[in-house]
Curated annotation (Swiss-Prot):
Known EC number: 2.1.2.1
Cellular localization per UniProt: Cytoplasm
The protein's name: Serine hydroxymethyltransferase
GO CC annotation: cytosol
Length: 418
């Protein structure tokens, strides 16, 4: 019987080897990809539970299948915890991803072809904020706003003037590579001025918002979307919040049956665990440590004139660095750092001159190293190791030194092998 095959290692050695190799990679590499984090064993246990067997189209108390009394409890726990965590009146926890959450929000707020003002991808926005290769840019008429050419920060007066000119039905705030706090109150004022809805995509900063160390968009946005991983440190999935009951009904209809069929109740259970973890007072200390570590790491780059820190600093979990004075492009930097077991990603910088396949910059985030227990001292050390590797990118002896120092750090802060 299939139920006898409960051990992946014995049943599927080929797959197990790949999983084990990934576990070893995470254990012994320094993870600086800003959209990644390390979940608890409790989150993983919930996601790997028997809930994966249950189909449950619909919502708690209103399902299209029988036998849903247990998953109703699970999903209701996730909903109520999300509402409490973010101070929202309504929450939908069924979206499979942040992109699905954004798609549902658009469906709830606007029609195909409507004009939307969103952050340009090159300035730090996201694919789902109007990229022409994404469903958002193909379905709606997106106009991109950028950052100020001198400060590399959002210029709210300029965004207001742009909104007046294009008269959008919706304004999208939020980013995937913007290192500064976003003034959601100003965005709402801009939206109100032109009669537009405001949607905030807080996927990257959700954990910081939950902990109260970053301004919350919930009091200002008509709809807030998010992922449940990244700084929130939950499973990979989506979340939608609103304080408007009429919009909540539209959101629910957009998610199901509009975009999705049955929800992933095992993932929703893992979301519930993550929300409970984030409601613990210790999570605020964790979120503040992310900000402290990121600022400390960024400061090392700011003090080295061979690198340029985009916008001059960071207020959150992420920052961008122009590396072109020491190496040809961000892609080469990413690949080189992979070789010394430091994982991050190439990233376009504002007013980028290179191809998006190469880029001038790299993006660095500190959520994952903070989850391992690393602090300011280790963050500064990691920054120096990155600089050491990039500056000496053709010196194998020095690169080997960096590898050894990385291994010492990861051994000192084990992930799951405690």
């Amino acid at each position: 019987m299939i139920f006898d095959k409960g051990n992946v290692e014995d049943f599927d050695k080929e797959l197990w080897d790949a999983i084990h190799a990934e576990e070893e990679r995470q254990e012994h590499h320094i993870e600086l990809i800003a959209s990644e984090n390390m979940v608890s064993k409790a989150v993983m246990a919930a996601q790997g539970s028997v809930l994966t067997n249950k189909y449950a189209e619909g919502y708690p108390g209103n399902r299209y299948y029988g036998g849903t009394e247990c998953v109703d409890i699970v999903e209701t726990l996730a909903i109520e915890r999300a509402k409490k965590l973010f101070g929202a009146a309504f929450a939908n926890v069924q979206a499979h991803s942040g992109s699905q959450a954004n798609a549902a929000a658009y469906m709830a707020l606007i029609e195909a072809g409507d004009t939307v003002l969103g952050m340009d991808l090159a300035a730090g926005g996201h694919l789902t904020h109007g990229s022409p290769v994404n469903f958002s840019g193909k379905t709606y008429h997106f106009v991109g706003y950028s950052v100020d050419a001198d400060t590399e920060m959002l210029n709210y007066e300029a965004i207001l003037e742009q909104a007046k000119a294009v008269q959008p039905k919706l304004i999208v705030a939020g980013a995937s590579a913007y290192s500064r706090n976003i003034d959601f109150e100003k965005f709402r004022a801009i939206a109100d001025h032109v009669g537009a809805y405001l949607m905030v995509d807080m996927a990257h900063i959700a954990g910081l918002v939950a902990a109260g160390v970053h301004p919350s968009p919930v009091p200002y946005a008509h709809i807030v979307t998010s992922t449940t991983h990244k700084t929130l440190r939950g499973p990979r999935g989506g979340l939608i919040l609103t304080n408007d009951e009429a919009l909540a009904k539209k959101i629910n209809s957009a998610v199901f049956p509009g975009l999705q069929g049955g929800p992933l109740e095992h993932v929703i259970a893992a979301k519930a665990v993550a929300f409970k973890e984030a409601l613990d007072p210790a999570f605020k200390d964790y979120a503040q440590a992310i900000i402290d570590n990121t600022a400390a790491m960024a400061a090392v780059f700011a003090q080295d004139d061979r690198f340029r820190l985009i916008s001059g600093g960071t207020d959150n979990h992420v920052f961008l660095v122009d590396v072109t004075k020491v190496i040809a492009n961000g892609k080469l930097a990413q690949n080189l750092l992979d070789e010394v077991n430091i994982t991050l990603n190439k990233n376009a910088i504002p007013f980028e001159t290179l191809s998006p396949f190469n880029t001038s910059g790299i993006r660095i985030g500190c959520a994952a190293i903070t989850s391992r227990g690393m602090g300011v001292k280790e963050s500064q050390t990691i920054a120096r190791l990155i600089i050491k590797a990039l500056v000496n990118h053709d010196q194998e002896t020095i690169l080997e030194e960096v590898r050894q120092e990385v291994r010492q750090l990861t051994d000192a802060f084990p992930l799951y092998k405690k």
